[in-house]
Amino acid sequence: MTQTVNEREDPLNLGGGGWASSIPLRTWSSYHRRQRGAPVSKRRYRDGPKIEYEASRKQPKQQRSPGSWFQPSRGPYWALYSNWERCGGPWRPPLIAFQSPLCPAQMIRAYGLHPLCVCCCSCWSGPWNPGWERPPGRKKRWGRRGRGLRRHPRRSFPRNPPIDLSKMLRPVNLSGWRAPGMRAPRNTTQFIMNQVYEDMRQQEKLERQQAALRAQQAQEGGISPGDSTTNDAPHSGVEEDSQLPEDLYGFMQDPSLTFSPALMQHNQSPTPGLVEEEEKNVDDDECDVEVCDEKEESEEEEEEEVDRGSEDEDVDEEEVEAAGNGEEGEEDQEEEYMLEETGLEEGEQRAEEKFLPLGMPLSILVGDEEERENFMNYDYLSQEQIIPNVPEADLFMVPDISH
């Protein structure tokens, strides 16, 4: 043997498998070969292929035969002196003719009497059948204590550690331990929301710094801080910023408000530089709206010219058709003009909606509180409008969509 099996005792294989190796050699007696039908050196799968070994022949097990007249079967050494018959009958005292005077050990075995103690104690209760008794060092396999003893008498500590029940209802860690960068936090949604809020706080902080910087620049420009209506400049800057989108929205809804003096008084800010910036922004927005309107009108005029050209080409075909179709054609043209006008209005509305600032409150689009209440309560609709009285025959009519 060149390899040690017990790697824990000889991890570097220093023993070399000789007489001084870490494995004690098996005894070379014939008993071990007969015992379980195994060869002398039982080869494992890790010992390598068979080279000089012979194929291990299976030896028949020694069967325990019942006692016969010429060779009674021998019981185990710990059940030698018993009166339990070999064939398995109940216990009865042996015949007096065959009895020899019992030595103290046989008396203890047979009657459970202690030679030194003639009292009623635990040493009296010996098992009648020694087959019920276990050989020393063997485990108790049945009884009222369940399968096996709870604590082995030779073992001072339990084999399995006690289970910590506090960890039983914890969520299962499916991913196991990973590197810190690879592991997602326990509540990923909460983590993402925290990041979002942190970004919002940083943005607010940046806006405050910018407002303070603007106020400082305005003060350096020669405007005394006493002119400002609010207590401190940074807060006034923030208020102006929040007020700006509403004013812009008002200007775009009604351009005549741009030049009204009342609005200018109402909208007057502590820094005229900011007022000029607002006016510039408003003018730019109006210019953009006008330019967009002009572009849309020019595109629509080109489309109308193309339509008219195609209409002129189609005139000859229409003359060939029946005279009754002329009235329908005029109605179609009127409908087209109406659609074009509505398209123009929608285009203007879209152009206005395009320039809505992102910070605009959505309550403007809903309307006043009274309208909102009516809208929610459906008070402006009568009961017949909500649930129209339709005859039942019409409910089961299937509209014909083939034409």
Swiss-Prot record:
Any matching Pfam family: CCER1
Record-linked InterPro entries: CCER1, Coiled-coil_domain
Chief location bin: nucleus
Cell compartments where the protein resides: Nucleus
Basic residues bias spans: 137-157
CC annotations in GO: nucleus
Region (Disordered): 1-23, 51-70, 134-164, 202-241, 261-350
Comp. bias (Polar residues): 261-271
Tissues expressing this chain: Expressed in testis.
Keyword set includes Hydrolase: no
Deletion consequences: Knockout male mice are infertile and have malformed spermatids, though testicular size and body/testicular weight ratio are comparable to those of their wild-type littermates. TNP1, TPN2, PRM1 and PRM2 expression is down-regulated in testes of knockout mice.
PANTHER family: COILED-COIL DOMAIN-CONTAINING GLUTAMATE-RICH PROTEIN 1
Function: Regulator of histone epigenetic modifications and chromatin compaction into the sperm head, required for histone-to-protamine (HTP) transition. HTP is a key event in which somatic histones are first replaced by testis-specific histone variants, then transition proteins (TNPs) are incorporated into the spermatid nucleus, and finally protamines (PRMs) replace the TNPs to promote chromatin condensation.
Name of the featured protein: Coiled-coil domain-containing glutamate-rich protein 1
